[in-house]
Amino acid sequence: MERPELPIGLPEDIEEKKTAARNWFEGLRDTICASFEALEDELQGPLSDQEPGRFVAKDWSREEGAGGGGRMSMMEGRVFEKVGVHTSTVHGEFSPDFSAQIPGAKEDPRFWASGISLIAHPVNPNVPAVHMNTRMVVTSSRWFGGGADLTPVLSRRRTQEDEDSQLFHKAMEIACRNHAVADYDAYKAWCDDYFFLKHRNEPRGIGGIFYDWLHSSEEAGGWNADFAFTRDVGRAFAMVYPKIVRSNFNKLWTEADRDEQLIRRGRYVEFNLLYDRGTIFGLKTGGNVESILSSLPPVVRWP
């Protein structure tokens, strides 16, 4: 989807709106971390004799000359081989070349951005990998973006008919259908198009939703409507993914399953380093490199 021209100008209470968004993202982070630790405790299948994992939080600040920072929350456990749930709130100025690519930045290079980003790589190949992020960005305009997508690592489960796929799609559809400012069909198609490895001519996973530059008019509800939808995307993810994990994490797997998982993880690496918009944005704006690249899986194999 082509980047739209967004209206220039900010509401008088933009600082209060920034605070509300930041508080939401950080609260969602804490909710998800607690939920994932509960999954670590509940495991009864393979590897249940190992200690359950716990998140380790690490706060970071941007280097001198830039503003803001964030928190990395990483866990390595018996359910999640590697999972990161990160929040950040940063501000500064875009470089001249990057300003031309960002709505509202040509007029003024200053920006503010806050959001949550999550990628989970489970131990059990029967449990699909997942990605979710939502964010608010302010330049001389303002907008929300984000989404969630599911990546089954076993080819027999990587279909639209699979029960995990249907459950995930339904959760995202409900989150969209409940808000007039959202367009489920467009966001689903955008996700399919975005999470596609062009050099391999194949999708990364089974999709989900993806949206960006959400800036509704005041007649349509404005910032409040956009924020309400973005919150429901986070709530939908926090509800549906633990259900999918619980339905799969006690199943047995084979060495062949593990090999397939590691090869599929390689597709994650390729996408994140070649195409991922969040990775590019973070590196271009002086973000925390350790946090940005923590989305990469811990063990990968290429055939």
Swiss-Prot record:
Pathways per UniProt: Porphyrin-containing compound metabolism; protoporphyrin-IX biosynthesis; protoporphyrinogen-IX from coproporphyrinogen-III (O2 route): step 1/1
Compartments, record wording: Cytoplasm
Record-level GO BP terms: protoporphyrinogen IX biosynthetic process
Site (Important for dimerization): H199
Record GO cellular component, one term: cytoplasm
PROSITE patterns: COPROGEN_OXIDASE
Cofactor: a divalent metal cation
Residue numbers binding a divalent metal cation: H121, H131, H169, H199
Keyword Metal-binding among record annotations: yes
Top EC class for this record: oxidoreductase
Source organism superkingdom: Bacteria
Region listing for Important for dimerization, in residue ranges: 268-303
NCBIfam families assigned: PRK05330.1
Subunit structure: Homodimer.
PANTHER family: COPROPORPHYRINOGEN III OXIDASE, MITOCHONDRIAL (PTHR10755), OXYGEN-DEPENDENT COPROPORPHYRINOGEN-III OXIDASE, MITOCHONDRIAL (PTHR10755:SF0)
Similarity comment: Belongs to the aerobic coproporphyrinogen-III oxidase family.
Name of this protein: Oxygen-dependent coproporphyrinogen-III oxidase
Annotated organism of origin: Rhizobium etli (strain ATCC 51251 / DSM 11541 / JCM 21823 / NBRC 15573 / CFN 42)
